[in-house]
Design a protein with these regions (language model features):
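Bacterial N-terminal signal peptides that target proteins for export
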Residues: 1-8
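Bacterial N-terminal signal peptides
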Residues: 8-17
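Bacterial Sec-pathway N-terminal export signals of envelope proteins
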Residues: 21-117, 163-180, 187-191, 245-254, ...
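Small/polar, glycine/serine/threonine/aspartate-rich low-complexity segments that form flexible
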Residues: 47-54, 101-158, 298-312, 341, ...
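Sec/SRP-type N-terminal targeting helices
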Residues: 74-78, 91, 127-151, 162-188, ...
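Periplasmic alpha-helical coiled-coil/stalk elements that build and connect Gram-negative outer-membrane
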Residues: 181, 187-318, 420-423, 427, ...
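Metallo-beta-lactamase
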Residues: 274, 324, 479
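Short terminal targeting/anchoring segments
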Residues: 458-478
C-alpha cells in the first residue's frame, strides 16, 4: 500500500478522535445544567435606540426585558461570545499552508533560467503532544506544465514526545484545556452577572411598589388630617370651614385647631416627599431595565406575603454543591494542577521519537527515485536549571494557598445561607408583629378620636395615635418587601435561577 492510499484513512481517524471532556467546574449536574441553560442560543449585540416603557409591566416582564435592553448586560454577553471564540481558535489542531515561488535568474557566464516551485503542507497536532506533518511539493521546475503534470513529492512524518511535554503536559492539550477552563469561568461569570442584574431589577421593582404603598399611606394620612381639622374647626368655632386666623372660643380650642392644621400641613409635606421618592424609584427601575426614564407604567405585580419554612441542615449542602464561587476555585485548582504538571514535565529529559516516509515522485525532473523512510530518537537532558525547579515550587505554593481559599469560601457560603435564613425568620416575625401593631394602632387612633370628640383629651393624644398608625403601616409594608427580597437572596445563595418562579 502506498503512503497516498493510507494517508486519508489515517488522518480521518485522528481527526475523529474524541476531544477533551467539558469543564463542569466541579458543580452538581443540576447546577451546571442551570448555568448552561441561562446562556442565550443566539447573541445580537447590535446597538438599539432607547425605547419607551410599555403602559403595563409585570415583574416577570421587567426581568425578561432587562436581558434585551440593559447596556451593561451586553458586556457580559460580549465576554461570553469572546470566550467561545477563543475556544474555537484554541481547538484548531490542523494547520494548512500553501506556498509558491517563481523567479528568473542568470548565473555569471550561464544562461537565464526559470525556477518555479509550489508546495502544500499540513500539520496536525495531537493532544498526546505528537504531531503529524504532511508535505507535498513540486520541486523546482522550469515550466508551469511540469508543475501541473508531474507527480508531486510527498513526505509523511510523525513526531511524539516520550517524556517532557507528553500527554497531559503537551502544549496542544494544555492550550485546549486552558481555553475550556476560561470558557467555563466566563460561563459562571455570565450566570452570576445575570443573577445580580435580576436581583437588582427585582429590588427596583419592589422599591417602586414600596414607594407607591408609602404614597397611598401618606394620602390616607392627609385625608384623615384634613377631616380632623375640619371637625375641630367646626366644633370650636361654630362656623363652617374657613382659613385660620379668626377669633377663637377659648385658648384651648385655638391650640387644638392649630395642632390639627399643623398635622394636616405636615401630612401634605410627607406626601410630597413620598411622591418624589416614587418618581426616583421609577426612574431607577426604567434605567436598569434599559428604557427611557420617562412615563409611569403601571406595575401589575403586587406585594404578597407568603411565609415559608427553611431547614438550614438541608439548604447548606445544596448551596455548597451549587456555589459558583467554589466552582471558580475548582477551575483555578485545575489550572494550578496543570501548571504543576507542566513544571514537573519540564524537568524530564526531552525525548522525541520520529518516524516517516518520503516519496519524491517526479520532482527530480524525470530521475526515478524509490520511496524512502526514516526513524529515530532525539534526546536532550537538562542537567541544571534553577528556573524549572522554581516553577514546580511556585505551582505547589499556589495550590496550597488555593486550598486555604477554598476552605474559607466554603465557610462564607455556609454563613451566607445562615444569614439569609436568619433574615427571613426575623422578617417573618416582624411581619407578624407589624400586623398586630397596625390593628392596635388603628384601634388606638379610633379611641383617641372618640375621647377627643367627647372632650376627654386634647388633640395631642390624637396626633400621637395618628403618627403611630402611619408608622405601623409603613413598617409593615417595608417588612413585607424586605421578606420577599430576602427570599430572592436566599435562592441566589442556593444557586437557584432567581428569574424562575417570579410572581406575575
Amino acid at each position: 500500500m502506498s503512503i497516498r492510499s493510507a494517508l486519508g484513512p489515517l488522518l480521518l481517524a485522528l481527526t475523529a478522535a474524541p476531544g477533551l471532556a467539558a469543564n463542569t467546574a466541579g458543580l452538581s449536574p443540576e447546577m451546571w445544567q442551570r448555568v448552561k441553560g441561562a446562556e442565550p442560543a443566539t447573541v445580537d449585540l447590535a446597538p438599539t435606540p432607547s425605547e419607551m416603557a410599555p403602559d403595563r409591566l409585570s415583574l416577570r416582564e421587567c426581568v425578561v426585558l432587562t436581558f434585551q435592553h440593559n447596556a451593561g448586560f451586553r458586556q457580559s454577553l460580549q465576554q461570553l461570545v469572546n470566550a467561545r471564540g477563543s475556544l474555537w481558535v484554541a481547538d484548531q489542531r490542523a494547520l494548512l499552508t500553501a506556498a509558491a515561488r517563481g523567479e528568473r535568474e542568470q548565473s555569471p557566464g550561464g544562461e537565464p533560467e526559470t525556477n518555479l516551485s509550489s508546495g502544500l503542507s499540513m500539520r496536525y497536532n495531537l493532544t498526546t503532544g505528537g504531531s503529524i506533518v504532511v508535505d507535498a511539493g513540486t520541486g523546482t521546475q522550469e515550466t508551469l506544465a511540469d508543475i501541473f503534470t508531474q507527480q508531486p513529492s510527498l513526505v509523511l512524518s510523525y513526531d511524539q514526545p516520550l517524556l517532557q511535554g507528553a500527554g497531559l503536559a503537551s502544549s496542544t492539550y494544555e492550550r485546549i484545556r486552558s481555553a475550556r477552563a476560561s470558557l467555563a469561568l466566563q460561563e459562571l461569570s455570565f450566570f452570576d452577572s445575570r443573577q445580580d442584574l435580576s436581583e437588582r431589577v427585582i429590588a427596583d421593582y419592589f422599591g417602586v411598589l414600596l414607594a407607591q404603598g408609602e404614597v397611598d399611606i401618606a394620602k390616607r394620612a392627609v385625608d384623615r388630617a384634613q377631616q380632623f381639622y375640619d371637625i375641630s374647626y367646626v366644633k370650636f368655632s361654630g362656623e363652617g370651614v374657613v382659613k385660620p386666623g379668626e377669633t377663637w372660643i377659648g385658648q384651648v380650642a385655638e391650640i387644638d385647631v392649630d395642632q390639627a392644621r399643623l398635622s394636616w400641613e405636615q401630612s401634605k409635606h410627607q406626601l410630597i416627599s413620598r411622591h418624589q421618592r416614587l418618581r426616583d424609584a421609577m426612574d431607577t427601575l426604567l434605567l436598569d431595565v434599559g428604557f427611557t426614564p420617562t412615563g409611569t407604567p403601571e406595575l401589575t405585580t403586587v406585594i404578597t406575603y407568603q411565609p415559608q419554612e427553611y431547614e438550614e441542615a438541608k439548604l447548606i449542602p445544596i448551596a455548597l454543591a451549587n456555589s459558583t464561587d467554589l466552582g471558580r476555585l475548582e477551575i483555578n485548582r485545575q489550572d494550578g494542577l496543570a501548571q504543576l504538571r507542566i513544571a514537573l514535565s519540564e524537568r524530564l529529559p526531552d525525548v522525541i521519537a520520529s518516524v516517516g516516509v518520503t516519496d519524491l515522485g517526479d520532482t527530480l525532473r524525470g530521475v526515478p527515485v524509490s520511496t524512502g523512510w526514516f526513524g529515530g530518537i532525539r534526546m536532550e537532558v537538562p542537567l541544571w536549571d534553577r528556573q524549572r525547579s522554581e516553577n514546580a515550587q511556585r505551582a505547589r505554593r499556589a495550590l496550597e494557598v488555593l486550598d486555604q481559599n477554598t476552605t474559607a469560601t466554603r465557610d462564607r457560603v455556609r454563613q451566607d445561607v445562615q444569614q439569609q435564613i436568619r433574615a427571613a425568620v426575623s422578617s417573618r416575625a416582624r411581619i407578624d408583629i407589624g400586623e398586630q401593631s397596625v390593628a392596635l394602632a388603628g384601634k388606638s387612633r379610633e379611641a383617641a378620636q372618640g375621647m377627643y370628640d367627647e372632650g376627654l383629651s386634647d388633640y395631642l393624644r390624637v396626633l400621637d395615635a395618628e403618627n403611630r398608625l402611619v408608622e405601623a403601616e409603613r413598617s409593615l409594608l417595608q417588612e413585607q418587601v424586605q421578606y420577599f427580597l430576602t427570599t430572592v437572596r436566599l435562592r441566589k445563595a442556593l444557586g437557584e435561577d432567581v428569574t424562575q418562579g417570579l410572581p406575575d
